[in-house]
């Protein structure tokens, strides 16, 4: 055992929870794509997404409970808190986007909605890849690559939003 190993926490619970949260984000994004690929029974599909979101909340609570009772953590407690909150927010925002379909009584999605959902799904997959590399940090270039790809996907989503808004206001009736 090296000197460094004596002072480095060997507990993997946080990394397990990060990976669980990232997997839940992938599940939520896949469910969002499912909603748009077959826009029928939207309420039932949304309830399935809501169940995924509740699973994410439970994982978030476990992570914060663990953080509150762990003295020596593998990362700074503030970093753990930020990562846990950010991963939870991904799922919460996916849930909120799907909920608005029901709130606004969207009867037929436009062509941009599925593209947004697929972009979100790709981002969630990158998050999962990046988070899985945190455990060992043997290849930080993979994490960096995931961050760069997530930024690229954000730019794609920005372009989609611009195109969707342009399309909306070029139609005869921007309300419907």
Where are these regions (language model features)?
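Cytosolic, long alpha-helical scaffolding segments
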Residues: 1-176
């Amino acid at each position: 055992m090296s000197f460094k190993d004596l002072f480095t926490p060997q507990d993997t619970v946080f990394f397990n929870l990060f990976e669980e949260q990232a997997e839940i984000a992938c599940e939520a994004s896949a469910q969002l794509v499912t909603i748009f690929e077959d826009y029928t029974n939207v309420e039932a599909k949304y309830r399935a997404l809501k169940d995924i979101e509740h699973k994410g909340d439970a994982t978030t609570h476990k992570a914060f409970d663990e953080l509150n009772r762990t003295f020596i953590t593998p990362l700074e407690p503030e970093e753990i808190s930020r990562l846990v909150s950010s991963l939870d927010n991904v799922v919460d925002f996916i849930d909120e986007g799907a909920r608005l379909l029901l709130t606004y009584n969207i009867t037929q999605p436009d062509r941009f909605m599925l593209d947004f959902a697929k972009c979100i799904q790709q981002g969630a997959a990158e998050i999962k890849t990046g988070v899985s590399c945190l455990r060992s940090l043997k290849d930080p270039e993979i994490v960096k690559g995931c961050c760069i790809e997530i930024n690229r996907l954000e730019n794609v989503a920005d372009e989609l939003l611009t195109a969707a808004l342009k399309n909306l206001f070029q139609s005869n009736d921007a309300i419907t």
